[in-house]
Amino acid sequence: MSKSKVENDIVEKQKIISSLTLMDDLFMKVVLQDKECTEYILQTIMGDSTLKLKRQSLQKNLSNLHGHSLVLDCLCEDGNNNIYNIEIQNNISGAEPKRARYHAGLMDMHYLNKGNHFSQLPKSYVIFITANDVLHGKLQIYHIERTIQESGKPFWDESHIIYFNTSYVDNSPLGKLAEDFHAKETEQMNSDILSKRVALLKNAKPNEKGGKEMNVLLENYRKKALKEGIEKGIEKGIEKGREEEYIAKQKVIQLMGLLAEHGRIDDIKKSSIDQEYLQSLLLEFGL
């Protein structure tokens, strides 16, 4: 690889890294490798500054031999044996109520061992951190729990679902956390804990610990972009069943690969929802 090529790659990688926020799920998983960051986020959402975690697992696979398995963004347990599933959701489809229900159900299945009584189920929280107000209630946070309709009293099954709407920013602790989730620059962040971790990752040299983590992250972004491009192209090609449509989708696949190689992650995201922008990129690359 020529020197100019190496230099260009470094510049492109730095552009990607600079554009990342906590709402980028892959970046968030790297940030949460520091358990103190997970604790701070939970403390703020739960309104409990004393909350401490015993353990956490990122990209935790919850298998289901008889149905749909899940890979959880973050699964953790506090000192009182309460369990939390934290999910970063940028798309409405990823934060549907029935998805939250399924997460809670599969967590219960994995935390109740054979022979144990149901009373031994831990208190559980499924927390969706969303980019938009997916429940359309114009609220910053939503707490969902079962109630007895006839009396209006709580049904104490200790299963909780929380939606944290990060599009709502104000001067409250939750509002400041929401602002931090969308900040590209550490100087814009309110939390010292989060900003310190983000700065370490974004400013680290390639041979340093944070730099190595970011190299893995960028490779995962490349693989994800290629996979999404291929799946999208194949799906559309099969649906249409026409040769010209198939050829067009092959061009989209090729485009996604080129964009990934050039580190243009924002263009991949935008082209997936903007058809005119997709066409302009195809022209740019002569496809």
What role is predicted for each listed range?
Residues 2-18, 22, 26, 45, ...:
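Short, charged alpha-helical interaction segments and adjacent helix-coil junctions
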Residues 163:
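Short hydrophobic beta-strand segments that form the core of ligand-binding sensory/regulatory domains
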